[in-house]
Amino acid sequence: STSPFYPLFAALDVNAKMHEGQSGQRLWADCVRVGIEARKLLMKTCKYIKPFVPAQIDGKSWGDYPTDEIAQNLRFFEFEPTAKWHNFEGYGEHQYFVDPCKFLLTTPGIDAETGNYADFGVPATILANFLRENAIVPEKCDLNSILFLMTPAEDTAKMEHLITQIKRFEEFLDADAPLADVLPSIY
């Protein structure tokens, strides 16, 4: 087009300036820390929905490490070829890592160690629709995972609200609530 869209150019210029130098690094470092704290809170609060990170590092719970240590060390996000928490195969040491700015959660239903279906499961699409009914929109979901993209706009309050809603969803699971109560808009 010969007519540029000036609001878009202005937004790009502002974004570039915000991320210039140390300020951009600080914005994203804070985002990573918020994501780590959210994973820790989810581990403490919820029993069915889990963050997609190793449960333990060197025999110690992932969530028991200091946030800054986790943020500064990629081993907390590493796919180790022999690890069973993800059960992925066919890659080398230090080849793949979980992106700390992708808040990826798993729902029960597939045993990660064997790849077999578990006796109890919750399709992530049900959780996604529950969250949408409560004004939280996930980026995407599949059978047993749901993804939220972290940006510097996320803060502790937003993540705590998300986890509170996930905890509410788990309470519906424990109560074996009818789907009409969990997702009233479909009825």
Listing of model-derived features with the role each one plays in the protein:
Residues 22-187:
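Non-catalytic terminal extensions of PLP-dependent enzymes
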Residues 2-16:
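PLP-dependent aminotransferase class I/II
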